[in-house]
Structure formats: C-alpha cells, structure tokens
Amino acid sequence: MRVITLAGSPRFPSRSSSLLEYAREKLNGLDVEVYHWNLQNFAPEDLLYARFDSPALKTFTEQLQQADGLIVATPVYKAAYSGALKTLLDLLPERALQGKVVLPLATGGTVAHLLAVDYALKPVLSALKAQEILHGVFADDSQVIDYHHRPQFTPNLQTRLDTALETFWQALHRRDVQVPDLLSLRGNAHA
C-alpha cells in the first residue's frame, strides 16, 4: 500500500506539516510505503510559470499515479487554502487523483476558517477525480501545541486525527474489495 503526503504550506516547519508528520508516523507503523512531498521540493519558477515538464512535477505525478491514497495538509489563509498549493494542484493532470482516497488536513488561526476545506479545497480535489474525499481534520492554532520539534496536539485534536487516520486506513482497504459489475450480474439474472 502506498500513500503520498503533501505539505501545502510554503513554510517549514508549520502547524499543517506537523499534522502530516503525525500521519506519516502512524502509517509507517502499519507498513505503508509513505512518500512525502512538500512545496519546497518544487522550484518556485516551475509552479508560477506552469512548467509541466519540470522534473520534480514529473516525479511527483508518477508517484501519485502509483499511490493508493493522498493526505494533503494546508494552512488556511484568508478563508482559502494555500495559494502555493493551488499552483501545484493546477499543474496536475485532470485525472491525477482517479482511484485515490484523499484525506485533507488543515490548520487556521480560528475555527472561522473551518469551511475553507469544504468550499475551497475539496472541489479542486474532486475536479482531479478523487475516488473518495474523506471528511478531514481542521485544527485551529491553539490545538497544535508544538510543531517545531516532535508534534504535540491537544487531546481533542489527537483523537480526531486518530479517527481520521483510521477512516483513511479503512477506505484504502475498501479499494481492494472486488465487487462484480452490476451490468454483468443483470445479464446473468436474465439468462
């Protein structure tokens, strides 16, 4: 099982990247291959000038194609997810998330930014044809106690992250279940 984690903050370390660090640790403990990407892996010029042939973008797209899921984390600024993340998502092929389970994670100054994930980020993930976009986790700044060292969260946030990661894990495994095609079943019923 392969998962890509994508840190959408233009800064590192950041509160949103600490959520990803926690997720990576949990998934690594479950023998999941985790490939981590952050915006610093891409030359700013490649993102700003839409260089679709950038080596980093090609590698990222190839790894994403082979992945089962994506966990994307972003800070919320002015009621929207990171503009730097948007520039990267705009460069991905139209069906880049086809067949993928996606878990969005976001941080913001206050809970007033909570809906930015649902109304700004999720539509873009959907446009990239994600198979399943999970509810995700939003954390306000007060819930991320330490992000400069080992991530530390309030108990409430830790519980929500654990629940979201469990849901992500279950969704990844649902992808493996082979369900017969409905049309072929109808054909057999009339035979």
From Swiss-Prot:
It comes from the Bacteria. It is an enzyme of class 1 (oxidoreductase). Pfam families: FMN_red (PF03358). GO terms for biological process: alkanesulfonate catabolic process; cellular response to sulfate starvation; DNA damage response. Induction: Repressed by sulfate or cysteine. Keywords: Flavoprotein, FMN, NADP, Oxidoreductase. Its EC number is 1.5.1.38. Gene3D superfamilies: 3.40.50.360. One of its GO terms (molecular function) is FMN reductase (NADPH) activity. GO terms for cellular component: FMN reductase complex. It catalyses: FMNH2 + NADP(+) = FMN + NADPH + 2 H(+). Belongs to the SsuE family. Homodimer. NCBIfam families: FMN_reduc_SsuE (TIGR03567), PRK10569.1 (NF007859). Catalyzes an NADPH-dependent reduction of FMN, but is also able to reduce FAD or riboflavin. This is FMN reductase (NADPH). It comes from Escherichia coli (strain K12).
